[in-house]
Swiss-Prot record:
The name this protein goes by in its record: 6,7-dimethyl-8-ribityllumazine synthase
Superkingdom to which the source organism belongs: Bacteria
InterPro entries assigned to the protein according to its UniProt record, in alphabetical order: LS, LS/RS, LS/RS_sf
Taxonomic lineage of the native organism: Bacteria, Pseudomonadati, Pseudomonadota, Gammaproteobacteria, Alteromonadales
Disulfide bonds: none
Binding, 5-amino-6-(D-ribitylamino)uracil: F22, A57, Y58, E59, A81, V82, I83, F114
Pathway: Cofactor biosynthesis; riboflavin biosynthesis; riboflavin from 2-hydroxy-3-oxobutyl phosphate and 5-amino-6-(D-ribitylamino)uracil: step 1/2
Keywords (A to Z) from UniProt: Riboflavin biosynthesis, Transferase
Enzyme active site: H89
Length: 158
């Protein structure tokens, strides 16, 4: 039996972070977590990281698609925060963001890591951006690092 796995070292690999400006008080902590993870754990050089800012989570998929079309990135990490309000807007934005990012990954065959937190309250968002519940930006970066290696290992497998 052949087992294909990945590790989190990605020296020489190129990553793009697509980041929502909306709810920046939470998202900036996700960005810090992702960058720290890429550089410290993944050993990715800061020159191999591109950060793209978009207005909100709904715009993340189209920016991720444009980056994937370039063919220069090994992995893309999408970061944002969608916090439930009093209208159905939350479901539309969160759902379309999720579907769009998954479609980019499947269409272009590169990992697109989902670091968009979807919460019922501001308190939950803060918890998931670096306090009680860890940092979902760091977790998304770890997933991207591992998947970049998994994809390379699948490509090289006999």
């Amino acid at each position: 039996m052949n087992i294909i796995e990945g590790n989190i070292r990605a020296t020489g690999k190129k990553f793009a972070l697509v980041v929502s400006r909306f709810n920046s008080f939470v998202v900036e902590s996700l960005v810090e977590g992702a960058l720290d993870t890429l550089e410290r754990h993944g050993e990715v050089n800061s020159q191999d990281i591109t950060l793209v800012r978009v207005p909100g989570a709904y715009e993340l998929p189209i920016a991720a698609k444009k980056l994937a079309e370039k063919g220069t990135f090994d992995g893309i990490i999408a970061l944002g925060a969608v916090i439930r309000g009093g209208t159905p807007h939350f479901e539309f934005v969160a759902g379309e963001c999720n579907k769009g990012l998954a479609q980019v990954s499947l269409e272009f065959g590169i990992p697109v890591s989902f670091g968009v937190i979807t919460t019922d309250s501001i308190e939950q968002a803060i918890e998931r951006s670096g306090t009680k519940a860890g940092n979902k930006g760091a977790e998304a970066a770890l997933g991207a690092l591992e998947m970049v290696n998994v994809m390379a290992n699948i490509e090289g497998a006999e």
